[in-house]
């Protein structure tokens, strides 16, 4: 008894590329982003992704993804806490909240000082960013370095250290940068499909 929807055309957009669309819209760079070279860095839950673009075109040989996401950080810290308290500890949500808020999680009814484990968390970010840096051939040519994703807050320090002469751009609510970019790209694509005589490319921004 439901509705039937026919999809006439589909558009594939890489996840960090959608974040670039969102960044351009939020920072009012829609008119200029198409001529600029950008690096989009997306530390997510399970993977650490990065994308180099010229305009909106992907530079495949400089873009990649590795298994170094926030889940790796949380599991590593949980293992250290478990050894410290002498009991298995797997409250990943509590660890995540503590990292984001700076407030101590409560373990066995007592606030637990996470400070001693922060260098360990930062080392995961440093390893991921160091790997990415080896893929970037001409960092001096990057006009935009954009940090998005749920792990942006933890990886920011390592990213800044890797690109000390660049300004690192951020967006509001970086966790939702990709999904908002997907929506905007879809809306632009739909509008171009409706407009007579237009057939906008998948990566082009209106």
What does each of the following model-derived ranges do?
Residues 75-83:
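Long, charge-rich alpha-helical interaction segments
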Residues 18, 45-46:
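Short, glycine/acidic-enriched loop or turn micro-motifs at the edges of active sites
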Residues 42:
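Conserved catalytic-loop position in the HRD/HxD motif
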Residues 87-89:
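Short, structured loop/turn "capping" segments at alpha-beta junctions
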Residues 1-38, 57-71, 84, 93-145, ...:
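Nucleotide/phosphate-binding catalytic cleft detector across ATP-hydrolyzing
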Residues 48-52:
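Short beta-strand scaffold segments in enzyme catalytic cores
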């Amino acid at each position: 008894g439901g509705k039937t929807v026919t999809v006439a055309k589909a558009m594939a957009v890489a996840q960090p590329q959608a974040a670039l669309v969102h960044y351009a819209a939020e920072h009012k760079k829609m008119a200029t982003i198409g001529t600029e070279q950008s690096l989009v860095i997306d530390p997510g839950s399970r993977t650490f992704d990065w994308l180099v673009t010229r305009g909106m075109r992907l530079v495949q040989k400089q873009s990649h993804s590795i298994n170094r996401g926030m889940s790796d950080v949380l599991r590593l810290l949980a293992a250290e806490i478990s050894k410290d308290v002498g009991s298995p500890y797997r409250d990943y949500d509590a660890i995540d909240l503590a990292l984001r808020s700076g407030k101590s999680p409560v373990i066995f009814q007592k606030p637990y000082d996470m400070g001693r484990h922060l260098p360990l968390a930062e080392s995961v970010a440093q390893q991921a960013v160091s790997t990415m840096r080896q893929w970037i051939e001409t960092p001096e040519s990057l006009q935009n370095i954009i940090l998005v994703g749920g792990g942006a807050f933890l990886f920011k320090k390592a990213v800044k250290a890797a690109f000390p002469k660049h300004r690192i751009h951020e967006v509001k609510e970086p966790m939702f940068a990709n999904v908002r970019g997907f929506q905007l790209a879809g809306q632009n694509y739909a509008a171009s499909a409706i407009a007579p005589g237009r057939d906008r490319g998948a990566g082009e921004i209106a």
